[in-house]
Amino acid sequence: MTLLAVRHASLGYSRHPVLRDVSFTLSQGTICCLLGANGCGKTTLMRSILGVIPLLKGEILLDSLPVQTLSHRQRAQAIAWVPQAHDGIFAFSVLDMVLMGLAPTIGAFSVPGKQERLKATEQLEKLGILHLATRRWNTLSGGERQLALIARALVQQPRLLLLDEPASSLDFGHQIQLLDTLAQLKN
């Protein structure tokens, strides 16, 4: 079954297309990698899939529904996004940042329970950063932040996971660990 369908999409900013007539489909369990030069539109495409950047032409369907017709909460429940960089100055703990990934499911102002905390610590452990759980976000390195954001996305258990240059800040060992984790998701 088709999870994501992009049909004849043209996208960009202020009527200036970055990408024109893009079409592809992805089935559940598919791993797809977008390759291209810096500035060619990879991030713009992902942000359009998220519904953040409107299409100039065409359509994007998630489970056969136009993305733009889904509520913010429906999109957040179905799609997890890890940006290239996240510079927050917040003093939240890493565990709290990962738990924020559950907000679309449990509610933005709900207090995560024991079950949610267990899910979050499992993701931190999978990525080899459980030891960072109590560290403050604003004290982390770029690679540590990237891994924490990936853990936050994984704890959501989304139907679609969008990762924008997920390994760019990671050392070789964590790159391998990330790829292993993603391969396990496919199965």
Provide a role label for each language-model segment.
Residues 50:
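Helix-to-loop junction immediately C-terminal to a conserved catalytic motif
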Residues 58-66, 75:
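Conserved ABC transporter NBD signature motif
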Residues 114-132:
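Conserved ABC ATPase "signature" region
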Residues 136-140, 144:
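Conserved ABC ATPase signature
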Residues 157:
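Conserved catalytic motifs of ABC-family nucleotide-binding domains
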